[in-house]
């Protein structure tokens, strides 16, 4: 019912604010560590060629749309066919025995709010059979609260369902911030925990939505 959901949401927000209070003494440290990390890590370009197809010999075609931040944008990969979307299209094609026609709309550094305002209006195609979204890292880095995160997610889903009412929407699992070796222990602790909270909120949100799904397994870099 609604009451357990309210209690759960209150608990999630409480955990977030508790984490925020713990991190207040760390904020100047996080700020300087973040700046140093940005200087140390080269700014990698996003992948080229944001559309393509796999296994054109199959009779049936599935149109795939991927939306998101750096992983979907193919940061550090030369072409999208060698990145997340290309690999996903290949897997789907082999399992479903279908020709996959794919298109990527993504930008490194974007939050869900950015995606709603800057990416969704650019999507001109009127028909997709599957939508896959990869978000969470930037919302955690900007210390977005669970309440605001879900509000932004709700808006994103609403915008997509207006344009693609019958298309299933899949959210990928959250980025493994706690395992990124470039990040310091304090960044791993604060941002890593927040990413996990946002992931749990997203999981709860998708439970009550028709044709909206979340893959909730926590990623480790060994996978």
Listing of model-derived features with the role each one plays in the protein:
Residues 1-65:
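N-terminal secretory targeting modules
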Residues 63-65, 71-151:
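Conserved SGNH/GDSL esterase-like catalytic core that processes O-acyl groups on lipids
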Residues 134, 172-173:
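Alpha/beta-hydrolase-fold catalytic nucleophile elbow
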Residues 140, 178-182, 222-223:
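Short acidic/His/Gly/Ser-rich catalytic and metal-binding motifs that mark active-site loops
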Residues 153-157, 199:
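Generic structural signal for well-ordered alpha-helices
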Residues 164-168:
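A short helix->loop->beta-strand "cap" motif at the edges of active sites that frequently abuts
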Residues 179-216:
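Substrate-gating cap/lid alpha-helix
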């Amino acid at each position: 019912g609604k009451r357990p959901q309210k209690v759960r949401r209150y608990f999630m927000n409480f955990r977030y604010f508790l984490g925020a209070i713990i991190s207040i003494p760390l904020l100047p440290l996080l700020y300087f560590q973040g700046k140093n990390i940005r200087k140390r890590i080269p700014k990698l370009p996003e992948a080229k060629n944001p559309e393509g197809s796999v296994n054109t010999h199959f009779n049936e075609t599935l149109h795939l749309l991927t939306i998101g931040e750096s992983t979907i944008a193919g940061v550090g990969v030369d072409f999208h066919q060698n990145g997340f979307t290309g690999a996903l299209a290949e897997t789907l094609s082999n399992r479903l025995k279908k020709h996959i026609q794919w298109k990527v709309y993504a930008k490194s550094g974007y939050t869900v709010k950015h995606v709603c305002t800057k990416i969704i209006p650019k999507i001109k195609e009127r028909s997709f059979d599957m939508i896959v979204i990869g978000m969470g890292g930037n919302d955690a880095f900007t210390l977005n609260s669970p309440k605001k995160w879900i509000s932004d997610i709700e808006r994103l889903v609403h915008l997509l369902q207006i344009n693609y009412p019958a298309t299933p929407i899949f959210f990928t699992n959250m980025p493994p911030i706690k395992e990124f070796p470039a990040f310091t222990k304090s960044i791993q602790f604060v941002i890593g925990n927040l990413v996990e909270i946002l992931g749990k909120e997203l999981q709860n949100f998708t439970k009550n939505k028709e044709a909206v799904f979340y893959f909730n397994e926590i990623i480790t870099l060994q996978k």
